[in-house]
Amino acid sequence: MRGSKPMTASALVLTTAWISLAASQALGATLTVKAGESIQAAVKRALPGDRIEVEPGLYKETVFIDKDGIELSGIVRGGQWPVLDGENKLNDGVLVSGHGVTIERLWVKRYKGNGIMTQGSNNYRIAYNVVEGPCFYAIFPQFGKNGLVTHNVAFGSEDAAIYVGMSDNVDVVHNQTYASIIGIESENSHDILIENNYVHDNVVGIATTMLPALPVKSSDRIIIRNNVVARNNMKNTAPPGAITAGAPPGLGILVLGTDHTTVEGNLIRDNDGVGVMVSETNFLVTTPDDRMDPFPDSTQVLRNVFLNNGSNPQGTLRDLLDIAGVK
């Protein structure tokens, strides 16, 4: 390769370590969980790098994964799924703190807090799941790096269906979200890609936000690209006092205080309030935070298709338009 340099001893050691780790994971055991058995019990037996396959059936439990390299994979057979049901009693469906974990092909429903959550987990993959409310967040990666959230269906959330919080380098691609307060949200995060999603029939379609009073004080380099953002006109039922309670229905894409945000190539249609709104944080949040810049800088809105937006703005959005003299 032109311009290449000999590998240093330290690089060779690191490369060898990665190869050894990959080989150990490839040789991991496969554990099978049958209907009536416990997924958590299988996680306890598993070693880092093992694969856990879950047969179709009903599982009423919370699954906590604190080991690295675990693959938790549902088996969908004849239209029958492995279903995790919180029965509106349990707080969380799947909680992950290990690195390199995969969660795929599970139907997760009726957890009061989060359907699938990673916290401090890096290099995770959340794919091909169905996460059904009522819940607060359907899919919630937080405090992690290098994540992939793809080909999921998430709906019925009391806040965001997919919520990427205080994270770096996460791709949210090829998902469908609906019937939630916000379809997809990136909060106080960096290098986030939101692409090729179908986001419809929420209060707000896609939001990238810079919120105060959080440990991460910046949000930068968010790309919202090639999504379909349609009919996000649902009545806002967020509880009083919640930040999202102030979000007016009909917002297609909201850029709230984040820097270097690119909104490009999206089809944005039939959102009654506005197709794309770029605003300082105070539009929704008035909590003071002297360590945070609430103003969005270097936003680009490029080559989007807008159809039939803005026909019935409501709430704070209508108030702003009235002040500006827009009828």
Q: For the regions a protein language model found, what residue spans apply to each?
A:
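Short glycine/acidic-rich loop motifs that flank beta-strands on beta-rich extracellular proteins
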Residues: 59-65, 81-83, 87-93, 112-118, ...
